[in-house]
Amino acid sequence: YYNMRGIDITEKCADFDVFFENASCPKISIGDGGNEIGMGNVELNLSSLKIKPSTTECDELLVADVSNWGAHGLIAMLSTLQNKDYLAAWENDKTLHMLSELGAVDGVSGKRTQTEDGFTSKETKIVINNLRKLSGFR
C-alpha cells in the first residue's frame, strides 16, 4: 500500500483488498489520490502520474477532491432520495479528534493533525453545509 505521495505504508495498513475483491455485493469506492481501493478502474489514466495507484477495481467509482467530501456527497444524495437529512448530525470535529487520537494522519501532511488532506474541519463544515443546501435541508 502506498499513500498519495508514493510512500510505502503497507506495514501500517490492514489488507482490505481481499475482502473487497471477494464481496458479492455491488462495490462503491471513493478516491482522491489514486491510491484508494477502486482506483484500479482508472489505472491506465493514472499511469502518467508520479504515484503508485491502487489496482483494485470496483463497480462504481466516485472521484473527489477529498475522499471524505466525496463520502459526504454520497450521503447528501441518499438524504435527497430518502428525504432525510443524514448530514445534520455529523460532528466533524469529534470525528477528526477521535481519528487523531487513534493515530490517523492527514493524507497530505502525514502528520497527526485534525485535518483532512490539509483542510480544516471548518472548511469541511462549509462543504457539508453546502451539500445540505443542495439537498434541500438548509
Model-flagged regions — what are they?
Residues 34-138:
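C-terminal functional extensions of proteins
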